[in-house]
Structure formats: C-alpha cells, structure tokens
Amino acid sequence: MTQLAIIGATASGKSDLAIKIAKKIDAYILSIDSLSIYKEIDIVSAKPSKKELEDIKHFGIDFLHVDDYFSVDIFINLYKEVLQICKEQKKNLIIVGGTSFYLKSLIEGLSAIPKISKEQELHVEIKLKNLQQCYDFLYSLDREYMKNISAKDSYRIEKALLLHVGSSLTPSEWFRQNPPIPVIKNIDIFNIDVSRDILRERILNRTKKMLDLGLIDEVCHLEKKYTRLPHAMNSIGIVETLEYIDGFISKDEMIEKISTHTAQLAKRQQTFNRTQFDTIRSAPLEKLEDIILSTLA
C-alpha cells in the first residue's frame, strides 16, 4: 500500500490533482481541510462536487456537524481508521488539503493525555469562566510553556489546565515525560508551487464563484441553525458574509475582504509548507502530476 500527501495553498488546485492521481493509482482520499470536515459548510469550504465525491471515496469530508467538538487527536484517530480500511480493501491513500498542520501532527505525533474524570472536567469548566485568572495561574506555574500562548486563547488554556488537573504536573513536565510518538514514519509529500499573482487571481475568481453558488444563503442557513458561537463560524468567508448580512459592508466590499483574507491565509500556508517539513517536493501544478506518477512508478 502506498501513501502520499499533496499540499498547497488554498485555491492552488490540490483537490483536482488528488482526484486525477487517485483514479490512476486506485486510491482513496483523506482530506486535511479544517472546514470541509463539517457538514453543511459546502460553498465556503469549496468541497469537491457530489460527482467527484462519488467517483473517488473521500474521508474527512462531511464528518462532523458545525457545532461538534474537533481536535487534532480526533483527526489522528480518523486517519488510523482510514488506513485500516485502505489496507483491508487494498487501496492506496492520498492525503490532501490546505491544513498542513494535520499532516505535521501525523508525522510528529501527539503526546498522550492524562485521563480526566467528569468531576475534573466540571472543575476546569467552572474555572474557565474567569479565563484571565486561569491564564495567570498557569503562567505562574509554567512560564516557559505559557509564554507562547495568548491570554485569550481559551482552547489552549483549557488544554493546559486539564493537563495540570489530570496529572498534577506542569504542561512542560507532562510533555517531557510523555514525548510524542509519530503516526506516519515515511510519506512522500508534494507541494503545489504557485506564484502569488496567479494565486490572488484564482482566489478572487473562486470568491465570485462562491457568491454565484449561493454563499449568502449558505451562511444564513448556518447562522440560523447553529448561531455564531461554534468555532467554525469564525472562518474566512463566513465572518465577512455575516458582516454583509448585518449591513456593515457592501457586497463588493464583502468580496474584496474575503479575497484579501484568503490571500493572507494562502501566504501563511505557503510559509508553513516551506518551513515545517524536512523533505518536500515542490513544483507547478502542471508538472506535479508527472512528478508524482514517476515517483510511484
């Protein structure tokens, strides 16, 4: 069984390339996209079409409801399930998407976490009502660990507090005693190299297409069903559309803001992909298919 990963900035053509390769090497696809994993976020996430999803089996798409809890460890467990399915059905596996942090987590692994009782969870939940107090306590306990965490980062503060409550150790002590174990040891990683100008043009065109496909109706539906509280509702494309719905910006301003924020995200993705993987092969989209197939030959 062969595994490979195709990564790249948003709107770089990853999904189309992965589907092409999957058809040629008899592979399933595991999406590493932080929005496509949610049901009903279809237009904003630019999911593959229904036909494409029927032609090639995809995992990691429409996996959760918008208000479901999601973390990297859930994704890692999903990967393990998908890997087993591929082995049983004698299929290859292509990991594809723009959230390369998930891929990095598979390669580097995650540390085990202590078992947390219901009583401890409730204790932490009550404490978190005063987020600043929790942050100050953790900072005094483990300055080295907390100095890289914002006082407003409720997710990471909660994780750090749960670690301490469950283990009676500081986060730094816990991670020293429980180093991460890699989940994937060897995988070929291919990155789509695209110029910033071309990417900006693709992003603008995709934003306009999203509007034509019913972006505003989708966001209205999501807000009505889930409110604005779930983490996914803070995503690019949703936030700007809500600003338009609220009457704060015009439709043209909404398109401009979505395009600008998406381009900024793409720049961060390109930097991450370039700096966070030891071995990676980058090439323009039009050349990468041949490079991948020749590598697998």
UniProtKB/Swiss-Prot annotation:
Q: Where is this site: Interaction with substrate tRNA?
A: T99
Q: Which UniProt keywords apply?
A: ATP-binding, Magnesium, Nucleotide-binding, Transferase, tRNA processing
Q: Where is this region: Interaction with substrate tRNA?
A: 33-36
Is the keyword Magnesium in the record? yes
**Coiled-coil region:** none
Gene3D superfamilies in UniProt: Crystal structure of tRNA isopentenylpyrophosphate transferase (bh2366) domain, P-loop containing nucleotide triphosphate hydrolases
GO biological process, alphabetically ordered: tRNA modification
Q: What is its EC number?
A: 2.5.1.75
Give the binding site residues for ATP.
G8, A9, T10, A11, S12, G13, K14, S15
Any idea which positions bind substrate? T10, A11, S12, G13, K14, S15
Q: Which cofactor does it need?
A: Mg(2+)
Which GO MF terms are attached to this record?
A: ATP binding; tRNA dimethylallyltransferase activity
Q: Which Pfam families match?
A: IPPT
Do the record's keywords include Amino-acid biosynthesis?
no
Q: Could you tell me the superkingdom of the organism this chain comes from? A: Bacteria
Query: What is catalyzed by this enzyme?
Result: adenosine(37) in tRNA + dimethylallyl diphosphate = N(6)-dimethylallyladenosine(37) in tRNA + diphosphate
Functional description taken from the UniProt entry:
Catalyzes the transfer of a dimethylallyl group onto the adenine at position 37 in tRNAs that read codons beginning with uridine, leading to the formation of N6-(dimethylallyl)adenosine (i(6)A).
Protein family membership:
Belongs to the IPP transferase family.
User: Assembly and interactions?
Assistant: Monomer.
Protein name in the entry: tRNA dimethylallyltransferase
Organism listed in the record: Sulfurimonas denitrificans (strain ATCC 33889 / DSM 1251)
Per UniProt, what is the name of the gene that codes for the protein in this document? Answer: miaA
